[in-house]
């Protein structure tokens, strides 16, 4: 079986809870289906989504069982010699398509508040 090599530009695109790649020790893992179940929580996974998470993974000291689980998510290798480019390409994490944008959230809060104020003033 031949190894698939990933360019950094492809890795950084997979940076949200529904579509998440991580690089650990030069290997690329699709952790999308595991992120919600991670014992440390989804937020820590999102902090490293689409990036090289080697240092964070090693610093925590994961168990053998965690290493075995990680291997099940292996999808290929980072193209050799592109490690620095991956660090440079770090993108801000993207928000899932089901997360409403901030202006919409503000409108949903402000407009009803204005409606209540107008209603109260008209009914005095």
Curated annotation (Swiss-Prot):
Gene3D superfamilies: Cytochrome b5-like heme/steroid binding domain (3.10.120.10). It is found in: Endoplasmic reticulum membrane; Microsome membrane. It comes from the Eukaryota. Residues 3-79 form the Cytochrome b5 heme-binding domain. GO terms for biological process: ergosterol biosynthetic process. Membrane bound hemoprotein which function as an electron carrier for several membrane bound oxygenases. Coiled coil: none annotated. One of its GO terms (molecular function) is metal ion binding. It is a single-pass membrane protein. InterPro entries: Cyt_B5-like_heme/steroid-bd, Cyt_B5-like_heme/steroid_sf, Cytochrome_b5. PANTHER family: CYTOCHROME B5. The keyword Mitochondrion does not apply. The chain crosses the membrane at residues 100-120. Heme binds at residues 38, 62. GO terms for cellular component: endoplasmic reticulum; endoplasmic reticulum membrane; intracellular membrane-bounded organelle. This is Probable cytochrome b5 1. Belongs to the cytochrome b5 family.
